[in-house]
Swiss-Prot record:
This is Gene 49 protein. Residues 29-38, 120-132 have a biased composition (Low complexity). Residues 1-38, 102-137 are annotated as: Disordered. Residues 18-28 have a biased composition (Pro residues). It comes from Mycobacterium phage L5. Residues 104-119 have a biased composition (Gly residues).
Length: 179
């Protein structure tokens, strides 16, 4: 490829393979009785040319990565607002939620707890986060966190109390009492 000339046919080119026949002239009709304002005509004829043109509003259903979202695009904020304040938009949102619920196996998306706020969530069950018998350990940084699981290296179970300070300041791990 040299410059913008391809050495082969571009399979994604929008140019037609053969010229299209010229459209037949449309018969003239009487002017319609509806009157549109100039701004409405401009807005209706104006297409958002690129994803960064205009304004968009994204509606994420429950905040999880797998949840659906609906993106409404318009020429300006008033255009987007006009689109979302319609019965059709509400019907669309209801339908999207119904379809998402069907594929998720539930009746609809459950609301997210707390919205996450960028905090790391633990995927361990509650029992794995609490030491047996409610045992707690402390270091110079405060209460330590109980961790248990299966070692990826050895495949053996482990249980320990870990310091919550930044990694470069952490105290040594402590092992729970064997009972």
């Amino acid at each position: 490829m040299k410059g913008n000339q391809l050495s082969y046919d571009d399979p994604w080119s929008t140019a037609p393979a053969q010229p299209e026949p010229a459209p037949a002239p449309e018969p003239e009709t009487a002017p319609s009785a509806t009157v549109t304002t100039a701004s409405a005509a401009v807005r209706d004829s104006m297409a958002v040319q690129h994803s960064t043109d205009g304004v968009s509003a994204t509606f994420k259903f429950a905040g999880q990565y797998s949840d659906p979202w609906v993106v409404v695009k318009g020429a300006d904020p008033a255009d987007v607002l006009a689109k979302v304040n319609t019965a059709e938009f509400k019907a669309l949102m209801d339908k999207v939620q119904q379809i998402a619920g069907h594929y998720a196996g539930s009746g609809g998306s459950a609301p997210a707890n707390g919205g996450g706020g960028g905090q790391q969530q633990s995927r361990a069950p509650q029992a794995a986060q609490e030491a047996p018998g409610g045992e707690k350990r402390y270091c110079q940084h405060g209460e330590m966190v109980y961790k248990s699981g299966v070692s990826k290296k050895t495949g053996k179970p482990y249980a320990l109390f870990s310091c919550t300070a930044p990694r470069d300041q952490q105290c040594d791990a402590q092992w729970p009492d064997k009972k």
